[in-house]
From Swiss-Prot:
Family annotation (InterPro entries): DUF167 (IPR003746), YggU-like_sf (IPR036591)
SUPFAM superfamilies reported for this sequence: YggU-like (SSF69786)
Protein name from the UniProt record: UPF0235 protein Mevan_0378
Organism: Methanococcus vannielii (strain ATCC 35089 / DSM 1224 / JCM 13029 / OCM 148 / SB)
Gene Ontology cellular-component annotations: cytoplasm
Cross-referenced NCBIfam families: DUF167 family protein
Family label: Belongs to the UPF0235 family.
Pfam families listed in its UniProt record: DUF167
Length: 101
């Protein structure tokens, strides 16, 4: 299932995510198999780009590399670009972080 939400590009690995704001804590949820997106919960409110900044900071801590929104959007459905060389790097981290694979 993880392979369905990530895609390798020249710049890194893209991950399709679905963001929930105003959460109790920042965390990686599960993979939504109907939307084919990784659930990411963020404490921050979606006001003036604060949630987007919180997403980037949180994912950067998890992946230990640069992360960017691709493109920046106000929608809860987003795609993030993880700066890394291999899909396997992202898959291994997601397997560790996802609540139920």
């Amino acid at each position: 299932m993880i392979e369905e939400i990530i895609k390798k590009t020249e710049k890194g690995v893209l991950i399709d995510i679905e963001v929930t704001t105003n959460a109790k804590k920042n965390e990686i949820g599960k993979i939504n198999k109907w939307r084919k997106r990784l659930e990411v919960k963020i404490k921050e409110q979606p006001i003036e780009g604060r949630a987007n900044k919180a997403i980037l900071k949180f994912l950067k801590e998890i992946f230990k590399t640069d992360v960017e929104l691709n493109p920046v959007t106000t929608s809860p459905q987003k795609t993030v670009l993880i700066s890394c060389d291999t899909k396997e790097y992202v898959v291994n981290i997601l397997k560790r972080e996802i609540k139920s694979v």
